From Swiss-Prot:
Gene name of the encoded protein: ung
One Pfam family in the UniProt entry: UDG
Reactions the enzyme catalyzes: Hydrolyzes single-stranded DNA or mismatched double-stranded DNA and polynucleotides, releasing free uracil
Name of this chain's protein: Uracil-DNA glycosylase
Any one cellular-component term (Gene Ontology): cytoplasm
PANTHER family: URACIL-DNA GLYCOSYLASE
InterPro entries xref list: UDG_fam1, Ura-DNA_Glyclase_AS, Uracil-DNA_glycosylase-like, Uracil-DNA_glycosylase-like_sf
Subcellular location: Cytoplasm
Catalytic residues (positions): D70 (proton acceptor)
Length: 229
């Protein structure tokens, strides 16, 4: 089980940034918890997909961070990228709203909910907590993942410049407010969460997709192609 969560699973650029986390006491406690959980319950995503966000978007290639909460807890949904589902899966409500805003903003219609194409272009689709029990939202909160993902965000803030942090909802905003206390050279886009409960409070109409591309263009970088083929 421990072999499933080794630093060797990460791209070299993330290994260099996160190597100290593997020796922290919280990490061995988290591993022990995960070993027990995967042995006795159905846990999402599959072990090999837990680090999919980091594997898909190496540290030196991150241009945008879209921060989620914890993985989808329905069967076959979570595959390691925040808000994303594998091809062929029905769109969860939050993702449906994300695609609705994308269409309003840029006229793009996406059918597949697999956001791998975004990750491949430098969009880090990172959840705050990387695992969950089937059918039990937030069941792995407070077990150590938050500290690990704090380290990820902190390394990006400290060791990269001009990353665009996209914070949808209070949880993402609160997490990053704590970490953004030092002066930094990054852009932050924030609005309510795309869930049906909050989307009408300001997520719809946020135009974050066009704003991200405006900022990238201003930096002289290639814009994100949000269309999923």
């Amino acid at each position: 089980m421990h072999e499933a969560f080794t630093i060797e699973q990460l791209p070299p650029s993330w290994q260099e940034q996160l190597k100290d986390e593997w020796s922290q006491p919280y990490w061995s406690q988290l591993l022990a918890f995960l070993k027990s959980e995967y042995a006795q319950a159905t846990i999402y995503p599959k072990k090999e997909n837990v680090f999919a966000a980091l594997q898909s978007t190496p540290f030196d290639q991150v241009r945008v961070v879209i921060l989620g909460q914890d993985p989808y807890h329905g069967e076959g949904q979570a595959h390691g990228l925040s808000f994303s589902v594998p091809r062929g899966q029905a769109l969860p409500p939050s993702l449906r709203n994300i695609f609705q805003e994308l269409h309003t903003d840029l006229g793009i219609r996406n059918e597949s909910g697999c956001l791998q194409a975004w990750a491949d272009q430098g969009v880090l689709l990172l959840n705050t907590v990387l695992t969950v029990r089937a059918g039990e939202a937030f069941s792995h909160a407070g077990r150590g993942w938050e500290r690990f993902t704090d380290a990820i965000v902190t390394k990006l803030i400290q060791n990269r410049t001009h990353v665009i942090f996209v914070l949808w909802g209070n949880a993402a905003r609160q997490k990053c407010n704590l970490l953004f206390q030092t002066k930094h050279q990054h852009a932050v886009l924030a609005c309510p969460h795309p869930s049906p409960l909050a989307a009408h409070r300001g997520f719809f109409g946020c135009c974050h997709f066009s704003k991200i591309n405006y900022l990238l263009k201003k930096q002289g970088k290639t814009m994100i192609n949000w269309k999923i083929e």
